[in-house]
Curated annotation (Swiss-Prot):
Gene Ontology biological-process annotations: Golgi to endosome transport; Golgi to vacuole transport; protein targeting to vacuole
Gene responsible for this protein: vps10
Sites where a glycan is attached: 300, 324, 967, 1265
Lumenal side: 23-1356, 1426-1487
Cellular location(s): Golgi apparatus, trans-Golgi network membrane; Prevacuolar compartment membrane
Name of the protein in its database record: Vacuolar protein sorting/targeting protein 10
Lineage: Eukaryota, Fungi, Dikarya, Ascomycota, Pezizomycotina
Keywords linked to the UniProt accession: Glycoprotein, Golgi apparatus, Membrane, Protein transport, Receptor, Repeat, Signal, Transmembrane, Transmembrane helix, Transport
SUPFAM superfamilies: Oligoxyloglucan reducing end-specific cellobiohydrolase, Sialidases
InterPro entries in the cross-refs: Sialidase_sf, Sortilin_C, Sortilin_N, VPS10, VPS10-sortilin, WD40/YVTN_repeat-like_dom_sf
Amino acid sequence: MITRWLLITSFLALAILSLSSAAKKSEPEITPSSFDNEPFSLFYFEDTETILMNTRDGNLFRSFDGGKGWEQVDDPNGKMKKGVRSIWQHPFDKNRAYALGANRRHWVTKDQAKTWESFEVDGYAATQHEPLIFHGWDSSKVIFQSDECMGRFCIVKSYYSTDDFKTVSPLRVSAGGCAWAVGHPQFAEGLNLEDELRDRVLCIVPGLKVPSAHANRLVYSDDFFRSDAEGTELNIQQGRPVSGILSAAAVKKFFVTAAKSQGTNELALYVTLDTKAWHRADFGGHRVEQDGYTLLESTNYSMQVDVLTSPSSNTGILFTSNSNGTYFTRNVEHTNRDRFGHVDFEKIADIQGIVLVNTVKNWDKVGSENEKKVVSSISFDDGRTFQSLKVGDKQLHLHSVTTFANTGRVFSSPAPGLVMGVGNTGDHLKKYSEGSLYVSDDAGVTWRHALDGPFKYEFGDQGSVIMAVSDKGTTDEIQFSIDHGKEWHSTKLQHKIYPKLLTTTPDSTSLTFLLVGSEESSGTKHVVYSIDFRGLHERKCEKDDFEKWAARLNENGEPDCLMGHQQFFNRRKANADCFVDEEFKDPQPIFEPCKCSFEDFECDFNFVRSEDGKSCVPAAPLVPPVGRCQKQTDTFMGPSGWRLIPGNTCTREGGENLDKDVERPCKDVVSAPSHDKLMAQKQVFNDARQFSEQYYYLERQASSSGDDETVIMLTSEGEFWVSHDHGKNWEQPLKGVKIAAIVPHPYYSDGAFLLTRDKQAFWTVDRAYTFKSFEAPIPPNQEGLPVLSFHPQYKDWLIWTGAVDCAHGDCHSDAYFSKNRGENWDLLLRYVGKCEFESRENRPGSEKLIFCQQYENENKKNHLQLLSSENLFSDSHVHFNDAIRYATMSEYIIVASRDPDNPDSLVASVSVDGRTFARAEFPPNVDVPVKTAFTVLDSSTHAVFLHVTVSDVKGAEHGSIIKSNSNGTSYVLSLNAASRNEWGYVDFEKMQGLEGVAVVNIISNVEAVLKKGPTAKKLKTMITHNDGGQWMLLPPPAKDADGKNFGCSVKGGKGSGQCSLHLHGYTERRDPRDTFSSGSAIGLMMGIGNVGAHLSGKDEADTFMTRDGGITWKSVKKGRYMWEYGDSGSVIVIVPELRPTKVLYYSLDEGDNWEPYEFSEVEMHIYRLSTVPSDTSKNFLLWGKEVESNRLATINVDFSGLRKKSCNLVENGQESDDYYLWEPKHPFQEDNCLFGHVEQYHRKKPSSQCWNNWREPHVHSIGRNCTCTRADYECNYNYEPQNDGSCALVPGLPKPDALAVCREDPDRVEYWEPTAYRRIPQTTCAGGLILDHVVSKPCPSKEKEYEKKHGISGTGLFFAIMIPIVAAAGVGYYVYAKWDGKFGQIRLGENAGTYEGLLSRESPIVTVPIAVIAGIVAVIRALPLLAMSLWRSASGYVRLGRNRAYSRPYASRGSFAARRGDYTSVVDDEDELLGVDDAEIDEDDEL
């Protein structure tokens, strides 16, 4: 019995052992699945083994068992098969995912792919923006974004759903997409703003008038733009809106937006915690440039940002913010980046404070011949200090984000403390293919070699299993370790594959891995392996199998503190023969508190770190307790400047208490006193004989940091001077070097080039703080051509046009190209005229487009041809064989060429796309058989004003001003007898900042001056308030500056033939910068002239000004004065012109009162009065010469001390204590309607004792639209204005061919019988008086369509009529303004049947008329072309001398570059169209 029992017992024991042995496997279970198409994207649903996979053919597959079995997903109607373009996982809801279709049908699952529901959106999923934007609090709220494109142009249309796409509603059309304010669950956490932020949406929308990136605005709505289609603009900086918004993104508890102004690459980053209070991020004086920053993985209490410092070497600086994202501290320099902005930076998962970073060791030597030497380092204290990675005593370097070969995190996973990477030991990082696999199980403190060669790797079962697969070509085996990478085992695969992806569940708690690869044999078969390690251990880990592991250790090997606590994990011991086997249960950290220390505190709001980083100093004056600080020597108890970092859990007892109040000196609270007087500072130039005309302001743009006001200038002796404080102090950085010319960078206001008379030249890109020299290939040209041409987008791209063979009788010019600011040069063309880059925003693919004039067959006796090329003239296209001159302005290229039918006459041809040109046709009632000269004046109101010379007889030069329709193809007469000078320049000037206001001088005695004899011109000044539709004389003021009556008077506020105000215009100015108006001082104009029957001589002139855009005028001073505006018009300075003085006058109330100020102890002749081009400074600079000593001097006059505070602007309200709403108006209209709408501007009240302190372009809004009146129309083609204001057909001319539109557009259904009128291009009026469309008729053979069309509803009829009209007109820029005003803003939800689509104001058709090629006349302010030019071209004669030829000094601010001088710089030779085309941002002046 006992024996039998022993036998049975032994048998059972053997059986149990056998079963145990069978259960414990040595290899994982591998299950392959084959697919005909490559897996495109896949992801796990969190806390499940459910996988969703999209293949490249558009099919969708799912697996519920970790990839062992797959099934194709389809909907009942079969639409999902081959219909899924991309899949998206909801980042905040583990149950939801989205499958976006290739068409307009999409799908959503709310149960982890078990079931799917379809939904439709009227648009394709966006490709340039995120197609889905998720709400951080409510997973049922999603924004869907689509790209609607025409050709290469796309706009972003956003839709929203609040119920998981059961319903979808249009949100709005935008320029940069929309986002939920709550973009992350942590946003506004604990702020009790749930009701306020629940539905808030932020969108990047275009400027009110300008569809360019630098005008984009950030607006929000709390009701999906239902109640207000425009939305509310966010006050981002100092309580005011910011333009130039490029991007906006949620980063955990932060919301960040970036803005960039025109004329700079510097970005301003703004951060908010609630979308209400915004702060500009301060990087300690470091610039953040466009495409030069990367938001990195951030913590709950700070942001990490890497800022590009060297584009050539792709290196940066890593910054870490304080808890509110306002102040950033520099952590690591020379971080390694790639050209896409990826940075070698990663935090170790789930462990606070450990960061791996790669830096460039030889950052200062990286170039074309020197490769980067990348080294790796690690921080255990949140980036405060870094140390090397070590394998024993050797340094280890690992490949990081920029060379990552898998998906997910690079080094770590939620497996506590386990870190892996591919790299090498030695001096620096080698190629990825030369690397090996290394592992650390103490969070990077120590490392060991794991496997030879590069591998893809993953962690499973909280680190109990590590799997790797070779990443060096093909393989048929995998490697795995179950002891933290100390020992490795291999297992064969069924196929030999190219591994593409190795992954597992996101929390790394599963024992199943997924390997995706392509078979080596076929290359078209794709395999997905499910690799299950469950059988390798037979038991589950118990308590004794775990250890308490400290996540961070200090330099002494002790647990370290961060954010007030130490962090520990219970993790499986490396040698434990068990699996944790707790799927989807993340390792939980254990926190133990620490005593508060220095590291637990940060600078409080309005405090910044001191230079040594050991204290916090006030960033703004402190407010002392009431009754304290009566004297500066007093003290008071105030804030220390420190605060405990929010979220920090340190124990205060026994620790540091840095945030307790401290005794502070009262000097910390006393701001710079308002001394109630001006400050003048004179600088004398003893060795200089004269100032040259070359002086330039390198003005900071709105997004630029810093506060210097830099001026650079030349003396007549070629001495170069720089001032960084607006002329208070000057220095000579290139003393001893004779500079011949200063060439400011027209697209980059921080840069300038200095040229000598030989090949030596200099550049600065940091606002003249430093200069670097370069050698040009040849000396500057001697033909009056621009020496340098600049690329609008790439600031380092240059074209140099220099002189060749001038000492040997064949003097000509050659053009060279440089991509690196003159370091290297390549020959473009020989025997050239002007060469320019023609890249523009509205010309996609034009980055390399260059235009050049070249003498045919490289012989100067031949004609100048106009060529273009997109490959540096490896090949080229000839556009014109006899191009006299060409110029570019805004989106247009205009060419003056010889008329083939009349060689003595000029013709103009225009292109928008830079590839196809068409001739511009002039109106028949301007009968000039031989067009010897014409001048293109302006196009800022989306129509071209052109002056056609009628007479070029010396002393009788004049012509007719004609105005184009919106696409430049049809011109009508606007005004006759406009005066010009012998050089072709016209007394015509647009008022900056206001639509449609222009001033011109006409000759009242044309017939007399045309007769032989000494009769002089009698000029009268006229003004238009509706863009040339109507002109009137300037109304004279009632009294002069002394309160006396003038010799004549008028009634009713109108000027008369015998009594009106006349102003000296552009052609009489000593300095072309002295324009009447300013782009920032809205409504203000100043000028010198007289009241009477006509304009008298300058010696009889007085000084006048207007505050209402030219409606009324007042005399401010007897005599001639120069003027300048400051602080956007809140201060005006005038100084006598060319007579000895030591006194200037200033007004702080828009000219109501004038105060004298003695700026010099001795009398001076003042030649020039200047300030920054935007007129936003409170500093002014006088340039002159002392009368007695004859010494040159500059005097800075500083007004900043006169007032203490900044004005308070309530942008979204109506008015405030400091501002009122001002509406421009027409003098003979009662409703303030101009161009079909009422514009409103915030203007400072003259009585307000404050400063504007704002550098942004002037903010304005469209208050309302108006019904149409006669003022919204102008005379049609072949019609001319009559004395009673009506339009009549020119005698002998036919009516316009109405049927032409039908012939040109075969799909057109109807046409309109021509009338005498057409709409002014920029009007936005709706309804009311209809003068241009009275009778419609069907196009031939379109009778049925016509009948069908006119049977539709009123709204549909409106669209059916207007859309063809808009298309026929060429879809120019005016449509942008027209449709914007008519509908206010896109109301996508109002009527799905009349959805504006591509005809909305943001539409590329409307804003970018790239398809319009024919007949658009150039947007050039001054383009004089004289008959002499033809003769010179034929004879080969070129005049080299210069008279008043100089570059325009105000080449600094993008949005204000055109406000000073409606003519760009020109050389004195009249055969030059434009000398410096720096005003090509003309259309962008006003946002």
